[in-house]
């Protein structure tokens, strides 16, 4: 069975299963929901089975490789494969998408299209992390944008058209640089088009060309991650999207930028990365503090959490720029950790809005009396976000801290400066998160709740189940981080072996 096309099955199963949904009766909401949830769960179980039985965790090379001709005259192949870098993010995709599907249970408007788009997005994201061909990588990068665009445009809030336009302009504009860079790398040095990552990694480019390619790819990933100053689409998008879509955006979409930065910029363009690494660290440090300060000034709950996400992505940049095993391990762990925590916070923001019908913090207050379970969960995940010891965020941020401190690439003064800025960001994080909790749950009673009993307003079994599923891996990773670090540790060492610091 090792020769079975497992990865092709994993990539195509959701979208092919989604093609059946249009044949369901339009009023069969429950049937569509359960069918989609069943497909997501089956996909996640299949991913887990394949990785447990066929993936060698101590081997840094690409495994489960598949290569099929797709478009002969372009030498365009369907090339798939996984390694330690992709396995954690594919598992995260399966886990978050399954829970986001369950979170979307209240959606009743045009459910057939909604759940088809959820499954199409699932395939696009898994396909991107499994791609071993740079043109296929670009194809999956673009394919994933279409479901997000429609989910935001149709099921978004009042300003959804503005947010959708901004989202597509930023992301599609950045994608052009991936296509241009991919074709340049593919044609360079030969009339034969070379697109697979393995052959591209063996190519040598003039330093000037490598720098230009690096900057082009970096712009695309800076939009997606996002990196200051190309981040402004994210708060608008999160502010208008349905909370199940927000879970996918925060949990998976942002991680595509970090993945591309490691997979292409670090692995394929190591000389340019060595030059730009100090700038990446500097931007990451500035982003942590800048986004934290902006987050504190936000009145809108979802926008505050969105800026919190931008701040936390600064740690990913510092870890990538540190060029140490510890720092890069921390960066990847931060992507996984934030995927879980960010998805939980946006889900909590969504179910809070369902009850209060407002996202403005200054219009809330005293809701802990009416929503004690939501209050408990919101407090727990906020503690995880501010990197409380014993939770995954603490381990990730500590590794990034340690990575920059032990790096031999930077001077003592530079490391001290970056560490101080990081520390300021870590101090600001509890300020805006605890302030958020105070405004939401403490103080005067929320007047709109006076006619409801506590049991009517608090989280139900479905919502509690989603939150418990998210808190378990956050605490588990925090207490035993090696359970996930072992997935990509050998790959991190392999990537950094290309650099001489």
Swiss-Prot record:
Its EC number is 7.1.1.-. GO terms for biological process: aerobic respiration; ATP synthesis coupled electron transport; electron transport coupled proton transport. It is found in: Plastid, Chloroplast thylakoid membrane. It is a multi-pass membrane protein. It catalyses: a plastoquinone + NADH + (n+1) H(+)(in) = a plastoquinol + NAD(+) + n H(+)(out); a plastoquinone + NADPH + (n+1) H(+)(in) = a plastoquinol + NADP(+) + n H(+)(out). Keywords: Chloroplast, Membrane, NAD, NADP, Plastid, Plastoquinone, Quinone, Thylakoid, Translocase, Transmembrane, Transmembrane helix. The chain crosses the membrane at residues 4-24, 35-55, 87-107, 113-133, 134-154, 167-187, 211-231, 242-262, 274-294, 310-330, 331-351, 386-406, 416-436, 464-484. The keyword Ligase does not apply. This is NAD(P)H-quinone oxidoreductase chain 4, chloroplastic. It comes from Physcomitrium patens (Spreading-leaved earth moss).
């Amino acid at each position: 069975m090792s020769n079975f096309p497992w990865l092709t099955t994993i990539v195509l199963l959701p979208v092919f299963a989604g093609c059946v949904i249009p044949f369901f009766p339009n009023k069969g909401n429950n049937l569509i929901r359960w069918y989609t949830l069943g497909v997501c769960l089956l996909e996640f179980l299949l991913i887990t089975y394949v990785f447990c039985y066929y993936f060698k965790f101590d081997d840094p090379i690409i495994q489960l490789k598949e290569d099929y001709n797709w478009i002969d005259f372009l030498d365009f192949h369907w090339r798939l494969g996984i390694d330690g870098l992709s396995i954690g993010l594919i598992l995260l995709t399966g886990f978050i998408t399954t829970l986001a599907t369950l979170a979307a249970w209240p959606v009743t408007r045009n459910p057939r299209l909604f759940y088809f788009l959820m499954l199409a997005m699932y395939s696009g994201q898994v396909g991107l992390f499994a791609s071993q061909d740079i043109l296929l990588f670009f194809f999956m990068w673009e394919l994933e944008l279409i479901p997000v665009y429609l989910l935001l445009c149709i099921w978004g809030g009042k300003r959804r058209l503005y947010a959708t336009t901004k989202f597509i302009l930023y992301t599609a504009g950045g994608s052009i640089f991936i296509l241009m860079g991919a074709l340049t790398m593919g044609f360079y040095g030969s009339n034969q088009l070379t697109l697979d990552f393995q052959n591209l990694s063996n190519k040598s480019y003039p330093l000037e060309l490598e720098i230009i390619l690096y900057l082009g790819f970096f712009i695309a990933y800076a939009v997606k991650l996002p990196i200051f100053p190309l981040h402004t689409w994210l708060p608008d998008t999160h502010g208008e999207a349905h909370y199940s879509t927000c879970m996918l955006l925060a949990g998976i979409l942002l991680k595509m930028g970090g993945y591309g930065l490691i997979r292409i910029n670090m692995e394929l363009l190591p000389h340019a990365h060595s030059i730009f690494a100090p700038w990446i660290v500097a931007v990451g440090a500035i982003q942590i503090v800048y986004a934290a300060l902006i987050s504190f000034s936000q009145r809108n709950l979802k926008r505050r959490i969105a800026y919190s996400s931008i701040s936390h992505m600064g740690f990913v940049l510092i870890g990538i720029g540190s060029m140490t095993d510890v720092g890069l391990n921390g960066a990847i762990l931060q992507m996984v950790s934030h995927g879980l925590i960010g998805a939980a916070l946006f889900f909590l923001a969504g179910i809070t809005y369902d009850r209060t019908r407002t996202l403005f913090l200054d219009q809330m207050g005293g809701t802990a009396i009416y929503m004690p379970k939501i209050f408990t969960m919101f407090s727990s995940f906020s503690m995880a976000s501010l990197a409380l010891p014993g939770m995954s965020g603490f381990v990730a941020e500590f590794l990034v801290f340690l990575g920059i401190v032990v790096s031999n690439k930077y001077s003592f003064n530079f490391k001290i400066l970056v560490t101080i800025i990081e520390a300021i960001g870590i101090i600001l994080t509890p300020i805006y998160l605890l302030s958020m909790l105070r405004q939401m749950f403490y103080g005067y009673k929320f007047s709109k709740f006076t006619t409801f009993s506590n049991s009517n307003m608090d989280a139900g079994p479905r919502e509690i189940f989603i939150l418990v599923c998210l808190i378990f891996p956050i605490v588990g990773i925090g207490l035993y981080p090696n359970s996930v670090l072992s997935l990509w540790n050998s790959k991190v060492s392999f990537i950094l072996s290309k650099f001489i610091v």
